Swiss-Prot record:
<dbReference type="GO" id="GO:0005777">
    <property type="term" value="C:peroxisome"/>
</dbReference>
<dbReference type="GO" id="GO:0016020">
    <property type="term" value="C:membrane"/>
</dbReference>
<dbReference type="InterPro" id="IPR004895">
    <property type="entry name" value="Prenylated_rab_accept_PRA1"/>
</dbReference>
<comment type="similarity">
    <text>Belongs to the PRA1 family.</text>
</comment>
<dbReference type="GO" id="GO:0005783">
    <property type="term" value="C:endoplasmic reticulum"/>
</dbReference>
<feature type="modified residue" description="Phosphoserine">
    <location>
        <position position="18"/>
    </location>
</feature>
<comment type="subunit">
    <text>Interacts with YIP1 and the Rab GTPases SEC4, YPT1, YPT6, YPT10, YPT11, YPT31, YPT32 and YPT52.</text>
</comment>
<keyword id="KW-0472">Membrane</keyword>
<dbReference type="GO" id="GO:0005794">
    <property type="term" value="C:Golgi apparatus"/>
</dbReference>
<dbReference type="GO" id="GO:0000139">
    <property type="term" value="C:Golgi membrane"/>
</dbReference>
<dbReference type="Pfam" id="PF03208">
    <property type="entry name" value="PRA1"/>
</dbReference>
<feature type="modified residue" description="N-acetylmethionine">
    <location>
        <position position="1"/>
    </location>
</feature>
<dbReference type="GO" id="GO:0005778">
    <property type="term" value="C:peroxisomal membrane"/>
</dbReference>
<keyword id="KW-0576">Peroxisome</keyword>
<feature type="transmembrane region" description="Helical">
    <location>
        <begin position="84"/>
        <end position="104"/>
    </location>
</feature>
<feature type="transmembrane region" description="Helical">
    <location>
        <begin position="129"/>
        <end position="149"/>
    </location>
</feature>
<keyword id="KW-0333">Golgi apparatus</keyword>
Length: 176
């Protein structure tokens, strides 16, 4: 019964999509992409060096996480897409669940009438759960998520700790 409640919450979430919400999300995405740094700046090998101590690592990471935040978000997004494309079963389960919820919501609470009988909405959600959960376990979402977290952390924190800060910021820190 708890799973049906969770599915009902997801269905309410999908009903909250409107053109205004989509437009506002698109505008926020555009503003985020406007802060994207150029590849020449992001992959500037002349600014890569080994930090002297852990304090410098912390300083570099703090600065670079703010400065390259859009680039890091793009890297995490690309890694997420790569993860789904290499785990096709997980992608199938996600598409199945989303399509199932959207399809059930299109019924608007009415029964689905088939030649095999009529099915109520809660029966359809139960059937979706009974199919998606076992296949979802086979798709190994936990190991995929852990790989994504690890690959993202190594990529982002590796770049942030090795990329030097601009010289101007070093002088600003000393005067404070």
């Amino acid at each position: 019964m708890n799973q049906l409640g969770a599915l009902a919450q997801v269905s309410r979430f999908t009903q909250n999509f409107s053109m205004e919400n989509i437009k506002s999300e698109f505008q926020s995405l555009q503003s985020k992409l406007a802060t994207l740094r150029t590849p020449q700046e992001f992959f500037n090998f002349k600014k890569i060096s080994k930090p002297q101590n852990f304090g410098e690592v912390q300083s570099r990471v703090a600065y670079n996480l703010k400065y390259f935040s859009s680039n890091y978000g793009l890297i995490i997004g690309c890694l997420s897409i790569y993860t789904l494309l290499t785990n096709l079963l997980l992608l199938f389960v996600i598409v199945l669940v989303v399509a199932g919820i959207v399809g059930i919501n299109k019924l608007k609470g009415e029964e689905l009438v088939t030649p095999f009988g009529s099915f109520k909405t809660n029966q359809l959600y139960t059937g979706l759960v009974c199919v998606a959960v076992p296949i979802g376990f086979l798709a190994s979402p936990i190991s995929t998520l852990l790989w994504l977290i690890g690959a993202s952390a190594v990529s982002v924190f590796g770049h942030a700790s090795l990329m030097e800060k601009p010289i101007e910021t070093v002088f600003d820190e000393e005067t404070v």
